């Protein structure tokens, strides 16, 4: 299809080209602006469902997820969207402690038991089991001929976590519907009830049954704001740019993460005085992590989609910076290649890189005063991640959309040289992570 300059696009042409870009803005807020009102008649229900498996190497985290979104059209282009997500998570996750040449014993988060990690192994907490149920609801309707508003709410529940949220977005067309400006917000109130209680930051892990350094429920609030513009350049090209701001306030610490307190010369974790691990208590000195109680994030996002003879090139870039001194870059590329009979394939490449938080530590040196904040959570460290994937999609005889997606995720991190002490130099301090993602989606 050759580019056609000098005329505005019809409403149907503009919807069909820019629909996928609208989802990128909404994903920042958790709102849902479905693809095309022209595909449904008033009174019809449209269902979009996916089943996903995510599995990490070395028997780490596994996620089995089912997600379904139902959308009903009403007269005058109004619509209601209802969403349900169920996640079942199992496996083991790093607890933050470093490897040692001797076995290490840890008190379980509940305080009612303990587990032992063999010498040389990465300390993993194998009590990572949870089920999350999330519900969303959004109402969308026009405001006049050129504006659209979407309002909604969300609730999700895990064993130790409750989320309540609201969101809203407004979008308006200009320039003969070739330019769309949008703005939105989301606000959430989250309540945390950690298993065994929330530990006092930077206090030691205690014996089984000793909860003297634990407190009760914690909470946090999160505000997200976004403004953006989508521009149709031609019949082949549409671009988008937006800016988002996120502010979190409250309990941002992970109550299940610890740091190793090490000898300032050898780098080995200090033994706990009088510890008898076989009787139920930590073998070494581990301190619970501490994070600031607020966080501000700024993000810039750009995306372009180019249509050429049925093929679609989709490229995007995101830059994020926050006051924890984390800077990240995300570059993503998709290329949709049509096949015969309404079939297609879509290769996918994603590259992500980030710097470590200013308070990230591999371990804590016992010869130095304790910092105000410290975390060994690898998610706050310096790492790069690459995702390679392939999606295969088709239409059924009943005109239903089906697709299968397979992706491989690889993450590798780096520890600043000045943080490595003594014997730590010979250990795998930031192990690589590999994961497989398989997803089956269908729409009817």
Spans of model-derived segments:
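Transmembrane beta-strands of outer-membrane beta-barrel pores
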Residues: 51-55, 86-90, 153-159, 172-174, ...
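Outer-membrane beta-barrel translocator domains and adjoining extracellular loop/strand segments
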Residues: 60-64, 83, 93-99, 153-156, ...
């Amino acid at each position: 299809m050759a580019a056609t300059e000098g005329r505005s696009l019809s409403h149907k042409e503009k919807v069909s080209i820019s629909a996928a870009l609208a989802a990128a803005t909404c994903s920042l807020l958790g709102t849902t602006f479905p693809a095309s009102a022209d595909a449904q008649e008033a009174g019809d229900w449209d269902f979009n469902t996916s089943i996903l498996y995510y599995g990490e190497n070395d028997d780490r985290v596994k996620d089995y997820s089912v997600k379904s979104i139902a959308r009903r059209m009403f007269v005058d282009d109004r619509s209601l969207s209802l969403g349900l997500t169920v996640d079942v998570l199992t496996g083991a996750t790093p607890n933050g402690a470093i490897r040692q040449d001797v076995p290490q014993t840890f008190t379980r988060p509940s305080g009612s038991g303990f587990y032992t990690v063999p010498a040389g192994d990465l300390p993993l907490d194998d009590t990572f089991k949870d089920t999350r149920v999330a519900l969303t609801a959004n109402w969308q309707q026009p405001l006049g001929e050129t504006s659209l508003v979407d309002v909604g709410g969300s609730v999700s529940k895990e064993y130790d976590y409750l989320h309540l949220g609201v969101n809203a977005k407004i979008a308006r067309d200009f320039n003969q519907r070739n330019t769309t400006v949008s703005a939105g917000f989301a606000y959430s109130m989250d309540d945390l009830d950690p298993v065994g209680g929330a530990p006092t930051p930077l206090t030691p892990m205690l014996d089984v049954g000793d909860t003297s350094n634990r407190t009760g429920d914690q909470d946090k609030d999160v505000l997200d704001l976004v403004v953006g513009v989508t521009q149709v350049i031609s019949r082949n090209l549409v671009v988008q740019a937006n800016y988002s701001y996120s502010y979190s306030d409250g309990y941002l610490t992970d109550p299940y993460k610890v740091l190793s307190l090490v000898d300032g010369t050898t780098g080995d974790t200090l033994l706990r005085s009088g510890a008898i691990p076989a009787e139920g208590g930590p073998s070494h000195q581990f301190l619970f992590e501490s994070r600031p109680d607020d966080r501000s994030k700024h993000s810039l996002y750009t995306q372009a989609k180019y249509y050429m003879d049925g093929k679609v090139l989709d490229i995007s870039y995101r830059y994020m910076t926050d006051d924890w001194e984390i800077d990240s870059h995300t570059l993503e590329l998709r290329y949709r290649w049509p096949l015969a009979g309404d079939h297609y394939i879509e290769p996918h490449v994603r590259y992500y890189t980030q710097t470590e938080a200013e308070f990230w530590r591999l371990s804590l040196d016992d010869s130095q005063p304790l910092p105000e904040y410290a975390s060994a959570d690898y998610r706050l460290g310096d790492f790069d991640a690459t995702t390679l994937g392939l999606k295969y999609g088709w239409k059924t005889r009943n005109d239903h959309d089906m697709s299968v997606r397979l992706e491989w995720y690889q993450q590798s991190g780096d520890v600043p040289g000045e943080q490595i002490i003594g014997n730590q130099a010979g250990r795998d301090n930031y192990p690589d992570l590999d994961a497989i993602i398989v997803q089956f989606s269908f729409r009817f």
